[in-house]
């Protein structure tokens, strides 16, 4: 069986408070976007993970797809499989590609082995794999709370008919580095309230808290956001802790940045 794990963007991201477990409480909106990997799972004599496309750091044994298989196998009698991932979504880019691969592995295994797991059951299985993994089970726009792994208001925003332009500039921003540059603050306008307003209002009100410190350290990322607005974006931002920048357009935008070995981009209808 084959599936196509998609990326996501963050529409706004508020860092609210530091948690006793060392993580942070956040509020954000996850929105699925059509930048996809390809995932195939077939029966095999022994369980193995292989990949192609973008290079995936680490060993096969540490891959999130294989980790998800192992978690499921602890609860259900799964036979061996060959998991192959063709990686197109940039890695460490604020697009949730690894989390999506894990979630789609769970969904595909659910189909392959006819486990008949509900969405809620699959969310519980993948939640330990990564904070935003559970989002990709239902895979619809939604508000995320706490560590980004509990949800409310599914379908909160619909950008159908718009276009998205994403550029990953080949800059790695470590998640810890991004959080270290943010001062948590609970005195915020709820992101859900902002998203209910017209798209034209978002530029003034919908903020990603990571941008200020990340832009100071990596001005090239800030420049990309400015270029999106110069191209006519109705809204532009950095996704998650970076470094991908996206613009939302009313019509198909013109390309202003060439792809290289380090820089990847995607233009697609939403």
Curated annotation (Swiss-Prot):
Active site per database record: 8, 132
UniProt entry tagged with the keyword Kinase: yes
GO term, biological process aspect, one: isopentenyl diphosphate biosynthetic process, methylerythritol 4-phosphate pathway
Transmembrane segments: none
Binding site residues for ATP: 90-100
Pathway where it operates: Isoprenoid biosynthesis; isopentenyl diphosphate biosynthesis via DXP pathway; isopentenyl diphosphate from 1-deoxy-D-xylulose 5-phosphate: step 3/6
Catalytic activity: 4-CDP-2-C-methyl-D-erythritol + ATP = 4-CDP-2-C-methyl-D-erythritol 2-phosphate + ADP + H(+)
GO molecular function annotations of the record: 4-(cytidine 5'-diphospho)-2-C-methyl-D-erythritol kinase activity; ATP binding
Enzyme class: transferase
E.C. no: 2.7.1.148
Lineage top rank: taxon: Bacteria
Function of the protein: Catalyzes the phosphorylation of the position 2 hydroxy group of 4-diphosphocytidyl-2C-methyl-D-erythritol.
Protein family according to the UniProt entry: Belongs to the GHMP kinase family. IspE subfamily.
UniProt-recorded name of the protein: 4-diphosphocytidyl-2-C-methyl-D-erythritol kinase
Organism listed in the record: Cytophaga hutchinsonii (strain ATCC 33406 / DSM 1761 / CIP 103989 / NBRC 15051 / NCIMB 9469 / D465)
Gene from which this protein is expressed: ispE
């Amino acid at each position: 069986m084959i599936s196509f794990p998609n990326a996501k963007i963050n529409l706004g991201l508020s860092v609210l408070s530091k948690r006793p477990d060392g993580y942070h409480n956040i509020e954000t909106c996850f929105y699925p976007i059509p930048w996809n990997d390809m995932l195939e799972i077939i029966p095999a004599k022994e369980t193995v993970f292989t990949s192609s496309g973008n290079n995936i750091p680490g060993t096969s044994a540490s891959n999130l797809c294989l980790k998800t298989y192992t978690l499921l196998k602890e609860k259900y009698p799964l036979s061996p499989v060959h998991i192959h991932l063709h990686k197109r979504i940039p890695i460490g880019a604020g697009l949730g590609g690894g989390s999506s691969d894990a979630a789609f592995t769970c969904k595909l295994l659910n189909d392959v082995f006819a486990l008949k797991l509900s969405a809620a059951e699959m969310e519980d299985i993948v939640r330990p794999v990564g904070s935003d993994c559970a989002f990709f089970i239902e895979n619809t726009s939604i508000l995320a709370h706490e560590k980004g792994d509990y949800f409310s208001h599914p379908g909160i925003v619909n950008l159908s008919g718009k276009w998205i332009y994403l550029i990953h500039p080949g800059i790695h921003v470590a998640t810890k580095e991004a959080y270290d540059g943010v001062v948590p603050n609970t005195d915020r306008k709820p992101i859900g309230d902002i998203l209910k307003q017209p798209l034209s209002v978002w530029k003034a009100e919908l903020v990603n808290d990571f941008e200020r410190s990340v832009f100071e350290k990596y001005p090239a990322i800030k420049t990309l956001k400015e270029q999106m607005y110069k191209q006519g974006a109705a809204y532009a931002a950095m996704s998650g802790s970076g470094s991908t920048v996206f613009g939302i357009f009313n019509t198909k935008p013109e390309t202003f940045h060439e792809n290289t070995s380090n820089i990847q981009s995607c233009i697609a209808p939403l």
